[in-house]
């Protein structure tokens, strides 16, 4: 069947396209560099023609609170309207574990706004909540660095590989709509400070990881279970300590 992947040229999108194509589906990447812009609506009608499923793994180019909210509200609204006209039967969106829980965080608030639009749409849907990706480990460490030290809260942390994310999103996309949320996570649960201490040691990174209960995650405070599933989740197969990309230098 024809499955359109919004954000299909990015980290998860490209893996998802490969996964779906290997299963024999017509997987079509849709992104600004393929002529599809969900913010303006450009190219949506054409790319959605004949599509059975749409998977949205797109992301905002800006993480400033107002900009990211505008991105998800506008792009999701345009996408859902175009899907309804095209007769799409299943909308799948990738979101974040813990997005709906306090404390409120700008990016998470924007993702919940996106989910609310999806839930109110007449199109059958599935929302996949994923934990943080292995591929973002260096970026998260860099964002948490001040004065040469990486400050991390000792909260629970259960990241997963992008390949596992793509595999699970593909599974959901090729199944029946759940009209609700599905949670996915990595196979191992850590304390966040311990995870990053081990990661930086493996990189021979000289930065000290400081355990700081008041450390923020991209500007927002964390509670012990903010970043992990609270109930049953489908677990990935890749362990970080044996993941092939663990020691790769950032591009």
Please describe what each predicted stretch is.
Residues 135-141, 146-147, 172-182, 205-207:
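Glycine/proline-rich active-site loop of Rossmann-fold NAD(P)-dependent oxidoreductases
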Residues 87-90, 95, 116-136:
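Conserved beta-loop-beta element that borders a ligand/cofactor-binding pocket
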Residues 1-23:
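N-terminal Rossmann NAD(P)H-binding glycine-rich loop of SDR-like oxidoreductase domains
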Residues 6, 69-73, 103-112, 155-163, ...:
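Short-chain dehydrogenase/reductase
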């Amino acid at each position: 069947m024809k499955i359109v992947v919004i954000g299909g040229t990015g980290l998860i999108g490209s893996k998802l396209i490969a996964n779906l194509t290997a299963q024999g589906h017509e997987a079509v990447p849709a992104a600004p560099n393929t002529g599809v812009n969900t913010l303006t609506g450009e190219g949506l009608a054409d790319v959605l023609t004949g599509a059975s499923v749409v998977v949205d793994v797109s992301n905002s180019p800006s993480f400033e609170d107002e900009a990211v909210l505008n991105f998800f509200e506008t792009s999701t609204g345009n996408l859902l309207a175009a899907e309804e006209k095209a007769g799409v039967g299943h909308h799948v969106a990738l979101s974040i574990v813990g997005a709906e829980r306090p404390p409120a965080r700008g990016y998470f608030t924007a993702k919940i706004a996106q989910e609310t639009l999806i839930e109110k749409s007449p199109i059958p849907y599935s929302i996949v909540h994923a934990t943080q990706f292995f591929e973002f480990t260096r970026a998260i460490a860099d964002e948490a660095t001040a004065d040469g030290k990486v400050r991390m809260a000792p909260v629970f942390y259960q990241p997963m590989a992008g390949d596992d994310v793509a595999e699970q999103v593909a599974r959901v996309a090729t199944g029946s709509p759940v009209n609700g949320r599905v949670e996915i996570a990595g196979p191992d649960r850590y304390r966040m400070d311990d995870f990053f201490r081990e990661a930086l040691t493996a990189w021979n990174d000289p930065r000290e990881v400081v355990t700081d209960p008041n450390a923020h995650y991209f500007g927002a405070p964390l509670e012990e279970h903010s970043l992990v599933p609270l109930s049953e989740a489908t677990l990935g197969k890749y362990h970080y300590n044996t993941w092939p990309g663990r020691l790769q230098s950032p591009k």
